[in-house]
Amino acid sequence: MEMMQLSFASAVVYSLIFFVFLLVKQLLKPKSHKKLPPGPWTLPIIGNLHQILGALPHRIFKDLSDKYGPLMRIMMGERTTIIVSSATMAKVVLHTHGLAVANRPINSVAKVICYNNLGVTFAEYGEYLKQLRQLYMLELLSPKRVQSFSAVFEDELQTFVKSIKSEVGQPMIIYEKSVTYLYSTICRVMLGNVCNEREKLIKICKKVSFYSAAPIRIEDLFPSMKFIISRIFSTNSILKDLLKDLDDVLDIVIAERENSQYAQEEEDMLGILLKHKRSDGNNSKLKITNKDIKAIIFELLLAATLSVADVVEWAMVEILRHPKVLKQVHDEVRQAFKGQKTITGSDLGKLEYLHMCFKESTRLHPAAPLLFPREAREEFEIDGYTIPKGSWVLTNYWAVGRDPRIWPKPDEFDPERFRNSDIEFYGNHFELIPFGTGRRGCPGILFGITEALYLLAALFYHFDWKLAGGITPEEIDMTEVFGAGCILKNPLNLIPRLAEN
């Protein structure tokens, strides 16, 4: 009891110190005479946090941008934040000024779980990042490499389908089934068929994703008081414990591979990374250590699992809500794979309509509605407005995807809008950039899309689906929850039935 009282008293004292310090700092802060982008009125100390916290920020930002324009400024605590809300402005910021916004903001969680910002997601822009992205694009996740994973995709897909068949007629959360398949698949393409620590690794990843899901950390918004805030609000101590567990498991995985005959093979990602480590950078400017390898393995485990499961669930829910679309998907998939026991990668390219559905779903429901944040490496100007060095830059892709100037009837799910269209998601068409673009765009776009299409094709080829609880497609709850991504508040609960074929 005394310990609880002491802990509460300490929290109160820290909070008072925090408030007084910020108030004094605000009063003493020199006024800037630079012309910043327009934006809503800000409160002392907290800025515009009162408008964001507890809400769906992509929706709030869209409403504000409708009033203040596609280049808007808000304050998130001490952080000047620029909100980009149109395809045209996204091209100006992310392409024309791409080098100026090539950094990621400092993130207290990423520093913990990404080995002090190693890997492509959170590394500071520079030679290390450029060389690492090249490794991803040319070796780890090149089109040829992704195609070579087909046998693994198809083998794991058979296990996935068997799992669902064993529960035919029973309600299931399709998101959870997808996550299990995706974790197993990415583990095999990264670590090979033999990895004794696979289950431990997946278990730790699930825990880390749970504790790192908050999109905004208070300590990152008030850097001048980070030490005090982290003592009051942070869960980083839990993440540090989990990272220690992760570190131990990955050390075992790497040691086992290095001490085996299999170490000389390169058919999986770990083999490629160890080859680069052994070469000690003789043929490259990139020198890879065990710490780099562990950071890469971990970021791929998270990125290739949760975000893909998110977009698969959204695609399923939209297809199921539209019976005519569902019939076309069934007809196409069952014709393409007629008589086959499983989905084959060589025939995925035939699924034109399913591709259209996937594009339309990511337009409406991107896994990351605000993309990954950028940070200005230098001060620059756009249309006479100053973008200060160190400011955060958020691209509200959710708003871009619902812009009526680009998309007729933008809130409707209409895959036909992509028929005979050359618009793709690879970063060149700024009206469709759910995976980012430019120097910080996702290097694993092809891998993620391939995973998602395998899953969707299998789900609609092998099974017919009925909504659990007797609800109709029109009654599906489309309420969103914003965390590490944007997901359904109530996961899609479905009852599978074997397809007649």
UniProtKB/Swiss-Prot annotation:
Its EC number is 1.14.14.187, 1.14.19.80. The keyword Oxidoreductase applies. It catalyses: (19E)-geissoschizine + reduced [NADPH--hemoprotein reductase] + O2 = rhazimal + oxidized [NADPH--hemoprotein reductase] + 2 H2O + H(+); (19E)-geissoschizine + reduced [NADPH--hemoprotein reductase] + O2 = akuammicine + formate + oxidized [NADPH--hemoprotein reductase] + H2O + H(+). Pathway: Alkaloid biosynthesis. It is a single-pass membrane protein. Belongs to the cytochrome P450 family. A cytochrome P450 monooxygenase involved in the biosynthesis of akuammilan monoterpene indole alkaloids (MIAs) natural products, components with various biological properties such as antidiabetic, antibacterial, anti-inflammatory, anticancer, and antimalarial activities. Catalyzes the conversion of geissoschizine to rhazimal. Can also, with lower efficiency, support the conversion of geissoschizine to akuammicine. This is Rhazimal synthase. It comes from Alstonia scholaris (Dogbane).
